[in-house]
């Protein structure tokens, strides 16, 4: 939830793209939907590398997904960055996506728009270069939590966080009976 309102920046030779993080999902080692659930492997070793690392993997053999590792070395916990509100580099995002709309409302779309590739797995998101997360203003809308989407195990856990009023992958009104609730420790806009 602390990543909501932060700015995700991608600097590539093509140009710079950025957006405000407006939707995330948490994954913990005891969670059956987490890639760390069965322990370390070659595929998920970055999850166990310590906080601030990018965990990038291929979903369904075609979508690159970006996670931020969020706990100490050896723990295996991350936050999937699901949606952004674009700030900078929108023309480049459109070229990469091959369309004018739906640039960053979904984890695969935002990775494509920002040029996030598998080579960034293990990249330190705290260094302020290449791909990084920077502080941003408090979110404009109310922060809510709901159950996660797109997982078959652990789907009942209310570990999806989003900013109401922003374009997210699946708007709360389309989530029937999935436990929409106010999040705790909501940061008030300045």
From Swiss-Prot:
Give the domain of life.
Bacteria
Gene3D superfamilies reported in the protein's UniProt record: Methylpurine-DNA glycosylase (MPG) (3.10.300.10)
Presence of the UniProt keyword Hydrolase in the record: yes
- Which family is annotated? Belongs to the DNA glycosylase MPG family.
Quote the protein name from its UniProt record: Putative 3-methyladenine DNA glycosylase
Q: Which Pfam families match?
A: Pur_DNA_glyco
Give the keywords, sorted. DNA damage, DNA repair, Hydrolase
* UniProt organism field: Rubrobacter xylanophilus (strain DSM 9941 / JCM 11954 / NBRC 16129 / PRD-1)
């Amino acid at each position: 939830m602390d990543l909501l309102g932060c700015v995700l920046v991608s600097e590539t030779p093509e140009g710079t793209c950025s957006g405000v993080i407006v939707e995330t999902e948490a994954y913990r080692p005891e969670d059956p939907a987490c890639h760390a659930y069965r322990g370390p492997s070659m595929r998920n070793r970055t999850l166990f590398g310590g906080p601030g690392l990018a965990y990038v993997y291929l979903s369904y053999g075609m979508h690159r997904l970006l996670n931020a590792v969020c706990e100490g070395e050896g723990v295996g916990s991350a936050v999937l960055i699901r949606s952004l509100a674009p700030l900078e580099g929108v023309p480049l995002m459109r070229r990469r996506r091959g369309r004018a709309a739906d640039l960053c409302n979904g984890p695969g779309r935002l990775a494509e728009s920002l040029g996030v590739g598998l080579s960034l797995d293990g990249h330190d998101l705290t260094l302020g270069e290449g791909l990084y997360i920077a502080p941003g203003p408090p979110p404009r809308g109310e922060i809510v939590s709901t159950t996660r989407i797109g997982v078959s195990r652990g789907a009942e856990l209310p570990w999806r966080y989003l900013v109401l009023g922003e374009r997210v992958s699946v708007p709360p009104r389309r989530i029937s009976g999935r436990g929409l609730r106010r999040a705790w420790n909501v940061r008030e806009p300045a």
